[in-house]
């Protein structure tokens, strides 16, 4: 049975727990929020094999305007910790894709990224000004967007976090991006125009295809699972469409 709250997560990292709590608070503001149950073998995975300790827990919801609200927390070999979150909109609604990832190796946050990625042409014009006003001046180690990252908006934030001040600031940025997402979702109604719905479907497909070009995801998982399982997990859990 899929955990409905992630309250049983074994991760005790304070940064991940803070982000997780903030995301859940914002998610609770969505209308018609319901849990989605999936195959347990893909949702909650634990291994205590020495040297290959592994903990992955996934949570799936849906809501008005969103086909899938996914949160993943994971710990690999007691050193690599990951928080992954993607909110996929229902293509009938004019809502961007919220994505957030945090990668922590021991106490170093090597990657922290958040974005509202457009799910249709020129959609970002509706919210670019809201994101550009969010203060990001505190960060000293911003990272370069990967080649496949043309799916992101011009306001995508990507950095390594060097100290507590930057960690706290990143939490605020994630919260602000989610606030904009909630605001957008509450001000839109379902469309019936087939062409615009098809365009949004294609944008989400491309988002998933480009994300799957991130080889780091599969390389980590392949240390613990065979290729068949990894492919299924990436395509059915992380980036399905």
Swiss-Prot record:
Its EC number is 1.3.7.5. It comes from the Bacteria. GO terms for molecular function: cobalt ion binding; phycocyanobilin:ferredoxin oxidoreductase activity. Pfam families: Fe_bilin_red. Keywords: Oxidoreductase. GO terms for biological process: phytochromobilin biosynthetic process. InterPro entries: Ferredoxin-dep_bilin_Rdtase, Ferredoxin_bilin_OxRdtase. It catalyses: (2R,3Z)-phycocyanobilin + 4 oxidized [2Fe-2S]-[ferredoxin] = biliverdin IXalpha + 4 reduced [2Fe-2S]-[ferredoxin] + 4 H(+). PANTHER family: PHYTOCHROMOBILIN:FERREDOXIN OXIDOREDUCTASE, CHLOROPLASTIC. Belongs to the HY2 family. Catalyzes the four-electron reduction of biliverdin IX-alpha (2-electron reduction at both the A and D rings); the reaction proceeds via an isolatable 2-electron intermediate, 181,182-dihydrobiliverdin. This is Phycocyanobilin:ferredoxin oxidoreductase. The lineage of its organism: Bacteria, Bacillati, Cyanobacteriota, Cyanophyceae, Synechococcales.
